[in-house]
Amino acid sequence: MSSEYYTTIGMDVSDRTTKVCVMSKEGRAPRVVMETTIPTTKEGLAKFLSTQDAATPVAFETGTHCRWMNEVAQGMGFKVYVANPCRLRMVTDSKAKNDKNDARMIARLALADPGLLHPVRLRGAEYQRMINLHEMRGLLVKQRSGIIVQLRAVAKSMGFRIAKVSAAGFHNLDRAAWPKELRDIAWPMLKNLEQLAVTIKTYDKLIRELAGTPAFKAQVDRLMEIHCVGILVATAFVAVTGGDMDRFERPRDVGPWSGLAPKQDQSGDVDRQCHVTKAGSPLLRRLLVESAQLIMRDCSSDTDLKAKGLRICARGGKIARRKAVTAVARSLAVLMTAMLKKPDAPYVPLSERCEKELLAMRAMV
C-alpha cells in the first residue's frame, strides 16, 4: 500500500539535537528537499514545524523524547507517526548508520508507506504517570532488597545469622537483636531502610489514589477479582496496555505481546525449543511472574491457573517449576485480557474439571 503523502518529515532524535530530513516525491522520484539540525527542545521543535505545512506528516522513533514531541506536533495540527525501532532493521542494522542517514530512511519509509514504520500508539498521560510511579517504587524496592541481602551476607561472614523477617519490617529489628560486632555496621543502613520504607509507602498511596480515578477504577476492580492479583499487578496491567483491549484481537495475543511466549524457530522438520522472547514491558512481566509464583504456592487457593502450573510441574525435569511459573504468568495475562474484554462475564476461579484434576494429583502424592 503506497503512501497518500507527497512530502514527509523524518527525524532522528538525540538527547541534545535532532536531525531533520524533509523528503518529497511530487513529480519525480523521492528527493531530499531540506536537511537541518534542530535543538531537542519544545521550543526548537515548534519553531521548525511552524515553517512547515501542517498537512505534512512527521515521523520519528520511540524514545525518551517521543511523548512530548508527539504532543507538540499534534498540537500544531501535524499527523505524527511514532516508529517502532525494534521493527526497523533497515535503520538499526544499516552499514552506514548515522543520524543523518537515519532521518533520511525514516522520511523515505513514511513517504513510501507509513505502515513500514510499524507505528505505535502512545499511552495517555494518566497511564504513563502510573507506570512512572511503578518504576520509581520498583527502584526503591530493589535498593531495599540489595541492602538486606548485603547485611545478611556480612552477618554470615562473621558467623552470625539474622532472624527471618519480611523486607518491609527488616528495619524494625531491635538493636539488641544484632551482635555487638555488627551494630555499628548495620545501624546506619537500618536507618536508611526505614526511610526507604516510608518512601515506598508514599508511592503505594499515590498508586492507590490514581487507581481510584475514572481512567483506572472499573478495570482495576475487575482484575482484582482474580486470586493473587493485587492493586500493583492490576494497575500495572491497565497502565501498560493503556486500558485498550481492542489492540488484542484475541486474549491469547497478549502472551507474545508481553514477552511471555517462547520464540519460534521452525523450518521443515526442525522445530527448536526456544526461551520466551522477553518483549514488551519488563515491569509488567516481572509483576505477572510474581503473581504466578503466589498462585503456585501450596497455601494459595485452588484455581484453574494453579492446576495448570501443577500439571506442568508433574511432568518433571530440571526446570519444570520455572516453566510452570512462566506458563501460569502467561495464562494470567490471557485471563486478565479476557476479563477486560468481557467485563460482564462472571469470573469462575476453579472449574469442575480442574477441581477433580487437583484432587487426583493430591491423591497420588
Name each model-derived stretch.
Residues M1-V365:
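A detector of single, family-specific signature residues
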